[in-house]
């Protein structure tokens, strides 16, 4: 797929409520927290627009939502270091995170593996197999490690500076989708994943994936992916 032009408008609505009693101490990047929390959170995203491709015009309207309610007591010691990998949902929804199961992976590529959350079924990390060994070795091969912003990292590969990653960009054939869930694991090219184009425009979409007070991941930004056949998703 090749994109000639596009116009997209985003609307986001985020609501959260929290009551808590906390005691926090911090030393350097280490944060110790003891807290009693009542939390609720909801996110609604809407994208409307048109995309001009060589095959014709795609009119898109995407609506997605996430919500949660939770009460918990928490004591934690956390090392705060933000890495924002890009995730593609093959079914077109927002990124899905498994808040129960984790796996060992060196996400910040410092030579030490951490326990991070698996993705939900039908979701995958956007990656580049830099050493062509057929596996994703660590976070250095996942978009989002370099700057902490996956969209900013991806924009570096926009050869024609049109705000789209598609077949006109040399990186397109190198990009992979690494899907790793509790049910399956594998690596797909964008073509095999039926991904036609990735739009670099994005919208702030803060949402926390938590389970019994444990923060497993945070959704920070969302953008639009176009699949072959004209279907659009987040």
Regions found by a protein language model. Give the residues of each.
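Calcium-binding acidic motifs and repeat modules
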Residues: 2-234
